């Protein structure tokens, strides 16, 4: 019998959850996704220092002020990594805009346009790029503008059906609901020792989004993310995309037990689901009613923002060293 990895590929596109090109090329996945936390890890590795140095030198040559130079460098690092990753996957790579812009629609639009243009300028194929935008109301509005300009978006930090519906109404390319972080919240909030896979709240959240989308023929793709266990992955077999850590991917490659498809369009069509109408006020109210989604969205933005600031500090020190050498 084939591995669980190969069986999963019959129903879902598998995505590598890593910003490390050397690791990605060993995974045999279709797509790859990065985030500030992953990029920070890569930037701290000696083998990628030349890539970091090149990005810094490029940023300095743009002759911006200190803030602009830092922005140029951070985006160039992402593009460098993204282009390197695309050498090893046949599909797309997701690059993320600065999480500190999460509540500023216009700033997110401008940053995403710059990132997309830089990606193309450096030789990237725009069709192979997804821009990751946080699932705030402002982020979803930014994604709507970008999609209308031909820039494909991955709306990330999805913790609720209401976010997913809002993103679908904005006609975004893809959403990323976070299985493991939802699971973590329920464990912490209620002191549970764990949930069976049948009762896993993270798995249930993604399944609900999948059912809603397929019931109403919504073309927005679903890329389940943030898995804690192999069992969570298998429980969502059939989801459009599954973005999986290298550790769990290796576990799937070693196991050969049969994999059963859990999600299908045919089954979703049978469900009694009513369409939801959303305005900004309804979106904000429903998010406010969902403590888990509100808290995890805020936490996710803080984590990505914090890692971006750490990366900025490292880059600032590199810039200072380069300036001192050239003085």
Swiss-Prot record:
The keyword 4Fe-4S does not apply. Pathway: Carbohydrate degradation; pentose phosphate pathway; D-glyceraldehyde 3-phosphate and beta-D-fructose 6-phosphate from D-ribose 5-phosphate and D-xylulose 5-phosphate (non-oxidative stage): step 2/3. It catalyses: D-sedoheptulose 7-phosphate + D-glyceraldehyde 3-phosphate = D-erythrose 4-phosphate + beta-D-fructose 6-phosphate. Its EC number is 2.2.1.2. Pfam families: TAL_FSA. GO terms for biological process: carbohydrate metabolic process; pentose-phosphate shunt. It is found in: Cytoplasm. Keywords: Cytoplasm, Pentose shunt, Schiff base, Transferase. GO terms for cellular component: cytoplasm. The active site is at residue 132. Transaldolase is important for the balance of metabolites in the pentose-phosphate pathway. Belongs to the transaldolase family. Type 1 subfamily. This is Transaldolase. It comes from Chlamydia muridarum (strain MoPn / Nigg).
């Amino acid at each position: 019998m084939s591995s669980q990895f190969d069986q999963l590929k019959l129903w879902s596109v598998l995505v590598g959850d890593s910003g490390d090109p050397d690791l990605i090329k060993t995974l045999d996945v279709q797509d790859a996704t990065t985030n500030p936390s992953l990029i920070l890890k890569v930037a701290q590795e000696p083998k990628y220092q030349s890539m970091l140095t090149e990005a810094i030198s490029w940023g300095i040559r743009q002759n911006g002020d200190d803030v602009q130079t830092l922005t140029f460098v951070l985006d160039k690092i992402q593009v460098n990594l993204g282009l390197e990753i695309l050498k090893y996957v046949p599909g797309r790579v997701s690059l993320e805009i600065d999480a500190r812009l999460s509540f500023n629609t216009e700033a997110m639009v401008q940053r995403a346009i710059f990132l997309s243009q830089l990606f193309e300028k450096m030789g990237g194929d725009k069709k192979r790029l997804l821009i990751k935008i946080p699932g705030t109301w402002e982020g979803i509005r930014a994604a709507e503008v970008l999609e209308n300009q031909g820039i494909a978006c991955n709306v990330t930090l999805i913790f609720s059906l209401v976010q997913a519906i809002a993103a679908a109404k904005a006609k975004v390319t893809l959403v990323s609901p976070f299985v493991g972080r939802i699971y973590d919240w329920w464990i912490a909030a209620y002191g549970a020792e764990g949930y069976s896979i049948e009762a896993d709240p993270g798995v249930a959240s993604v399944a609900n989004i999948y059912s809603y989308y397929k019931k109403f023929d919504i073309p927005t793709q679903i890329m389940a993310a943030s898995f804690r266990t192999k069992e969570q992955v298998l429980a969502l077999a059939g989801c459009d995309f599954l973005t999986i850590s290298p550790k769990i991917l290796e576990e799937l490659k070693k196991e050969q037990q049969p994999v059963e498809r859990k999600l299908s369009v045919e089954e979703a069509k049978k469900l009694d689901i009513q369409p939801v109408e959303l305005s900004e006020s309804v979106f904000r109210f429903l998010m406010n009613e969902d403590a888990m989604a509100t808290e995890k969205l805020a936490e996710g933005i803080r984590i990505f923002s914090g890692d971006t600031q750490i990366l900025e500090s490292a880059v600032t020190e590199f810039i200072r060293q380069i300036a001192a050498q050239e003085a």
